[in-house]
Amino acid sequence: MNCLYLDGAAGVDVRKNYAFTARGREALCRRFLPLGGLVPVVTCGRTELYFPCPRADAERAFSAFLKERAACAREDNAQGSGAAGFSFCGGREAVLRLFRLAAGLLSMLRGEDEILGQVRDCYEFSRALGASAGMDAAFQAALACGKRVRAETKISSLACSIATLAANAAFRFCAGGNALIVGATGKMGGAVLKNIASKGGWKIVATSRSHAFAASAAGVTAADYAERYAFLDGADVIVSATASPHTVFTADKAAAALRTQKPRLFIDLSVPPDIEAGVADIPGCTLLGLDGFRAAAEENNEKKRSAIAAAEKIAEDCAEQFFADEAARKCAPALAALPEMERKSLYALRKSDAAAFCARAEALLAGKENP
């Protein structure tokens, strides 16, 4: 298995071009079917492509997909220029990366829980399309690793979330006031809503495209998404956390809606961004995007260094055990041909020292050990 990835090391202005919608991910998976399949892991912080084919074949297929996508202009955010900005890792390194990803060790906030569900959803998406063949075992083992890390370490209990950081930014901006939250029915928007509502001293307008949405918390008013600009002028803090591929707040419309000049904090938790960068140029307005939370995330990560180290060890052990299981499967006929005592010794080695077992298994496959 190999991996092409674009993560938080690239700014949101780059990542937004590869924030594929479900339609885009389906088309990309189908493009890779003749090459053996693909599992694209797409979140607000990364786009990672896991595939069994050689790197060169994957890069050609990915570049061709992006060119077609841009040409038809029907797929939103069709601006990716190819795989040039993506990093690559292959074989054992790619598998270990997947395990660390599921464990939350590659997240901006180490150990956050959401990534495990995101990896699972992306894997299930590809599996439903028949695009995960040959990678099922790796993804299932990675998901099990992610669960084990959270069960055996304190990394999740010590972790906060981007939603918590966003709420804290709102609290630092003003002790209380009026908040407008767009995308309140999503996981991120809903978490921000809950955090701000629990603080007290806030009046919240929560908008959603869903007609089924109803505000239940005290001090929360439900509004239709189409009315979002009408509530801007009264808001002190505006949080946008939608999955929309389109701009939610343009600078021109926001400026026209803001009749009262006062300090306002806009928080954009989406990739691609919901809020046009020009909003920051409106007098009194401050714009904070996802990448603006990195300093706060690093501060949180420092508090759980020992838990991170323990999680890294578990991820490495899980990966080695996966490699040992795969090696045992590949050399099963050679193992079966060994004398009973030697075979039992190797199976015991598989449990006690997975790396050493892999080395012996590779030697068997290469014919360097004769049954």
Residue spans for each PLM region:
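NAD(P)-dependent dehydrogenase/reductase Rossmann-like domain
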Residues: 1-2, 12-29, 43-46, 124, ...
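Adenosine-phosphate binding glycine-rich loop
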Residues: 18-19, 254-265, 269-371
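Helix N-cap motif at beta-to-alpha junctions
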Residues: 51-59
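Short amphipathic alpha-helices in soluble, non-transmembrane regions
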Residues: 58-71
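Glycine/serine-rich phosphate-binding loop and adjoining beta1-alpha1 elements at the start
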Residues: 80-173
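Hydrophobic Val/Ile/Leu positions in short beta-strands of Rossmann-like dinucleotide-binding domains
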Residues: 181-182
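NAD(P)-binding Rossmann-fold cofactor-contacting core
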Residues: 188-190, 199-218
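Rossmann-like NAD(P)-binding element
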Residues: 228-251, 264-267, 271-272
